[in-house]
């Protein structure tokens, strides 16, 4: 009996400890929108950590802050009406300095450092950031390639080599280079976030066992939800076992999603083309992408789906289904194996294989680039199956464009515009093997006089039940150094 009582006391002691609450105002935070509250917030986190864990509460109010340093076994709870505000750097005060990284040459500055953030954690476990409040990153810098000095923050949330992390129910606004940079994080759950920012939304880099669901991400100047596998950790690590489901990505003018205005007038993206906003695998791809499932997602006023490996990683076993897109500014589907090779010397070219894309509906897509599947000479993309695809393109392609030569550009940054206008109206495939396209219907808002499909160095292709809705349809196939495709009704 005494033994049972002892264990019950231990259990309730652990339960109370794990559910201890720490109000940031009790540690000196004012929440008045003027005072810098990060010292008080960090004191509350330290107290919770010393107690063995707990919940750090932000009541309603605005909390200007510099770097907030997470600890293990901590929940950050932003209550309704609370705003965690990224403060503007001053000569006297600012964010934590970017930590040294001897592998920084393999990726941009923004991917190489984690401490120069509004909220950051490293080598932690059991961390939750949640609540109905807002993270406002107004004071963060949005640059990525240029080195930023001490005191300048460029990410809202950065996590490195952590496990058992949950992000839920937050709203995030203007969050610098990344709303979230998670690198080397295992067992990561991201649910019901609303993000309206001026660069990347969710960057999931070298992570394993990730669940992204029910998120709304508006990123006109960069990618919305993006999986990466850089070399910033100093070793190769795949991003694997990831599901992305029930999400909405867009490229509306920044701040207009959370405000409900959904304004489409905005300057072009940093690369000189139309807004981003999409779901993408890549560009950083020293490691690989394996066992990825993307389903039930909507793209609006943004670029299309992109699957890219250009730094030596393997991209394989990818399943994508039930996708709808509207007002798409470049290729609805872009699959690229390239040779940029931002990896240690001697890293071989990567691979792409076993890709399945099913049940995709696209309306009002830019016709310049068509759907693109492009490997490299002697490095074929393999085993791609695209089925139940309906696309309505803008059209407008000319007969003269049908003779355009598509450059290889093996080392160039991967975007559809790297190839210029494509000589096919629906699909261009190059350096690929075992490609199957079935149950496809393609229409054009204005006539397009380019051939429908161009195959270049393609082996073992099958086209089944492909319908082209266009009067005076031009040639269906153009073949260059390719096997004759099997065409089935």
Report residues per predicted region.
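Bacterial Sec-dependent N-terminal signal peptides
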Residues: 1-21, 258
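Extracellular/periplasmic carbohydrate-active domains that bind, remodel
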Residues: 17-489
């Amino acid at each position: 009996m005494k033994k049972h009582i002892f264990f019950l006391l231990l259990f309730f002691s652990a339960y109370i400890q794990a559910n201890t609450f720490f109000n940031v105002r009790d540690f000196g935070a004012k929440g008045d929108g003027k005072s810098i509250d990060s010292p008080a917030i960090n004191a509350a986190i330290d107290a919770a950590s010393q107690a063995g864990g707990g919940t750090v509460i932000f009541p309603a109010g605005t909390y200007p802050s510099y770097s907030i340093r997470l600890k293990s076994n901590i929940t950050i709870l932003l209550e309704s009406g609370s705003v965690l505000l990224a403060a503007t750097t001053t000569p006297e005060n600012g964010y934590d300095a970017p930590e040294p990284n001897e592998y920084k040459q393999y990726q941009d500055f923004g991917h190489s450092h984690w401490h120069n953030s509004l909220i950051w954690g490293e080598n932690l476990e059991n961390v939750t950031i949640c609540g109905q409040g807002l993270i406002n990153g107004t004071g963060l810098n949005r640059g990525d390639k240029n080195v930023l000095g001490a005191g300048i923050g460029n990410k809202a949330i950065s996590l490195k080599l952590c496990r058992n992390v949950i992000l839920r129910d937050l709203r995030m606004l203007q969050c610098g280079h990344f709303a979230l940079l998670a690198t080397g994080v295992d067992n990561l759950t991201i649910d019901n976030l609303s993000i309206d920012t001026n660069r990347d939304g969710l960057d999931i880099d070298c992570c394993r066992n990730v669940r992204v669901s029910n998120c709304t991400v508006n990123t006109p100047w960069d990618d919305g939800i993006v999986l990466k596998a850089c070399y910033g950790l100093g070793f190769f690590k795949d991003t694997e076992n990831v599901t992305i489901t029930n999400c909405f990505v867009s490229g509306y003018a920044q701040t207009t999603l959370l405000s409900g205005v959904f304004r489409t007038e905005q300057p072009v993206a940093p690369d000189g083309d139309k807004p981003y906003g999409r779901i993408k695998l890549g560009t950083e791809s020293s490691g690989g992408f394996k066992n990825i499932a993307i389903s039930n997602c909507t793209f609006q006023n943004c670029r299309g789906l992109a699957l890219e490996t250009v730094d030596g990683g393997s991209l394989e076993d990818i399943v994508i289904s039930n996708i709808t897109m509207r007002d798409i500014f470049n290729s609805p589907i872009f699959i690229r194996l390239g040779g940029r090779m931002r990896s240690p010397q001697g890293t071989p070219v990567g691979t792409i294989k076993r890709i399945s894309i099913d049940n995709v509906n696209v309306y009002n897509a830019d016709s310049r680039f068509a759907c693109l599947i492009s490997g490299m000479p002697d490095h074929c993309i393999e085993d791609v199956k695209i089925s139940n695809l309906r696309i309505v393109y803008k059209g407008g392609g000319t007969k003269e464009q049908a003779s355009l030569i598509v450059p290889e550009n093996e080392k160039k940054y991967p975007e559809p515009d790297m190839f210029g206008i494509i000589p096919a109206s629906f699909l261009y495939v190059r350096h690929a093997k075992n490609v199957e396209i079935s149950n496809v219907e393609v229409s054009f808002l204005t006539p397009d006089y380019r051939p429908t499909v161009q195959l270049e160095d393609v082996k073992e292709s099958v086209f089944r039940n492909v319908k082209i809705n266009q009067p005076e349809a031009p040639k269906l196939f153009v073949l260059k150094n390719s096997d004759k495709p099997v065409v089935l009704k």
